[in-house]
Amino acid sequence: MTNRPPSAYRTNVGLMLIAADRRVFVGQRARQPDAWQMPQGGIDRGETPLEAAGRELWEEVGTAKALLLRESREWIAYDVPEEQRPSHWRGRWRGQAQKWFALAFTGNDSDIDVDAHDREFTAWRWV
């Protein structure tokens, strides 16, 4: 088990938001309309992975109506090809190390508002 992320990777959280009928939330990426994904985002300085998960849920999905089911035990690291690395990384990272969170959605569809904050997603659905 790895409790600390590898140093050459940007720390990040991923969220699997699960509805009562066991479908999973996915959002259509604002900057890549052909791409649909689960919410994810970086961990801010001084923030725990769980705190980052709550913040990302609020910023990207527009809700806080969820209960924690499980957190991944290990950091899951992957490399990003050099030509696809964002310029704002400025060579600091070779990829991302993620902690994943399974969350039970406790609200109604009307409690989701992807337009509320960051506008990472232009549309959403349960799959």
Sequence positions of predicted segments:
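Unchanged
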Residues: 43-127
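Short loop segments at secondary-structure junctions
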Residues: 19-22, 30, 104-109
